[in-house]
Amino acid sequence: MPEVDYRILILDLLRERGPAKTICPSEVLSDNDKQNPELMEEVRAAARTLASQQRIEITQRGKVVDPAQFKGPIRLRLKR
């Protein structure tokens, strides 16, 4: 099975939604994969990478958070 590049999937989904919208990291995964904590962590790691590259923002309760410091539920959006 080929390795999935979650960075591309995150960016594609965010571009599809538009600049004013956010996504939950779980939306990147298929329904079956959403229950796999290892895959969920891979998506969150991809989000951290994109945020550190200034391509997206990671938010909690509508506020941008440090990609290296967040814990708990997050949302992703294109960099404003």
Residue ranges and their predicted role:
Residues 38-59:
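Charge-enriched amphipathic alpha-helical scaffolds
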